[in-house]
Amino acid sequence: MIRRALHAVLGPSAIRICGCALLVAGVLGGLFPACAARAAEAAPAMPVVAPLHRLMVEREAAEVWGIAAPTARIAAQIHAESLWRPKAASQYAHGMAQFTPATAEWIAAKFPDKLGGFDPWDPVQAVRAMVIYDHWLTTRNPGATECDTWAFGLSAYNGGEGWLRRDRKRAAAQGAEDDVWFGQVEHYTARAGWAKRENRSYVERILLKLEPAYHAAGWSGAPACEVTP
């Protein structure tokens, strides 16, 4: 595979996104225009209310991940889910972290010591549930790198763990690398077209666009994916 060959020659710091590479200083960059296009979008605007929740997000993330908590990544996910609106509501999901009633009921029963009586409309409880669910999903669905692990976790958060596992199985059956998201598993699914687009866009937007924007604004945590313009 091109990705593995480049990894062997250039090392992991040069290879990360798109399954084909974002290479520093433009080395071989002309060969991978699609990768450059993914990272080239202007930084998204951060809602003015986001900094008001920063200490709460840092506290809740640290409860699960400790001092190295990926606060900027959690902030990026909240941004994608609800634009930081505690009363955000869609047809099937509610609150800042957009939990469906079924998932809210499940996670409250799964983690009663931390989420007993979980109210998805409460912003603190919503963020607490999000970080706990993210940790549960990423632990159960590891990938080749931290970037891949988080891509799998976010895909499962958005579309369900069952769909993620079917996608990985389909990728492996077609000879793709089932532990790599970008350029590999992301291309394999039996989901409806709209569901695939929504799910893949969700992962890409959080990891490649929103998380870097929150890092640039000073939110803490090491990036999951290396994004080189």
Identify the meaning behind each predicted range.
Residues 69-76, 94, 147-155:
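Alpha-helical scaffolds flanking conserved acidic
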Residues 2, 17, 35-51, 55, ...:
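Non-catalytic cell-wall polysaccharide-engagement segments
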Residues 1-12:
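N-terminal secretory signal peptides that target proteins for export/translocation
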Residues 64-71, 79, 136:
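Generic signature of mature, soluble extracytoplasmic domains
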Residues 18-30:
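Bacterial N-terminal signal peptides
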Residues 52-65, 88, 96:
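Peri-catalytic and regulatory segments of divalent metal-dependent proteins
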Residues 79-103, 160, 206, 210:
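Cell-wall polysaccharide-cleaving catalytic domain and substrate-binding groove, primarily
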